[in-house]
Swiss-Prot record:
Encoding gene per record: rplC
Subunit-structure text: Part of the 50S ribosomal subunit. Forms a cluster with proteins L14 and L19.
Post-translational modification: Methylated by PrmB.
Span of the signal peptide: none
Protein name: Large ribosomal subunit protein uL3
GO molecular function: rRNA binding; structural constituent of ribosome
Modified residues (N5-methylglutamine): 152
Keywords, sorted A to Z: Methylation, Ribonucleoprotein, Ribosomal protein, RNA-binding, rRNA-binding
GO biological process, one term: translation
A Pfam match: Ribosomal_L3
InterPro entries, sorted: Ribosomal_uL3, Ribosomal_uL3_bac/org-type, Ribosomal_uL3_CS, Transl_B-barrel_sf
Role description: One of the primary rRNA binding proteins, it binds directly near the 3'-end of the 23S rRNA, where it nucleates assembly of the 50S subunit.
SUPFAM superfamilies on file: Translation proteins
HAMAP family associated with the record: Ribosomal_uL3_B
Amino acid sequence: MAIQLVGRKAGMTRIFTEDGVSVPVTVIEVEPNRVTQVKTAETDGYQAVQVTVGSRRSSRVNKAAAGHYAKANVEAGRGLWEFRLAGDEKEINVGDELTVADFESIQMVDVTGQSKGKGFQGAIKRHNFSMQDATHGNSLSHRAPGSIGQCQTPGRVWKGKKMAGHMGAAQVTTQSLEVVRVDTERNLILVKGAVPGAVNGDVILQSAVKAR
């Protein structure tokens, strides 16, 4: 797996091409990702890199985390993220910083984030079911899901049946987004289109799996 970066969704805007075409873009701020730990097959059974980003007051860091950051001689961040390594990446050491400059040669990215929570929703909104008749004798079942199973055989509702429930607030990955611009001076990456999550939410970027 290629190097991944943790960023923050700053919002959306648009830019214009030389031909005057308006391109909607999402601005992702990628502060330097500080490496707190490098895991190897010999010591941990697999290859991975652990990073942190941002900052956090010392009073908000527990003793275990404070010791972990101190061992790596890295400033405490707002969280820890771990990414698997394939072994063919550049050499990464504890204390190194991964920046947007590592993505200058990448044209397509996959962006992972937590989708906006919608609370408890019905089957129509949650699963895009069709509504039932508004009239013609239908009085109470306009937005009902309809049948949820068979008869005495199997005599139960199948696992995974699409029904009403909590919608959103789940990990979502949008694949193969075009990288429109990389601003190394301001630590920004502009990608074409929308990415999951709300403004100021954490997102993870990696080179597009289907474009490698």
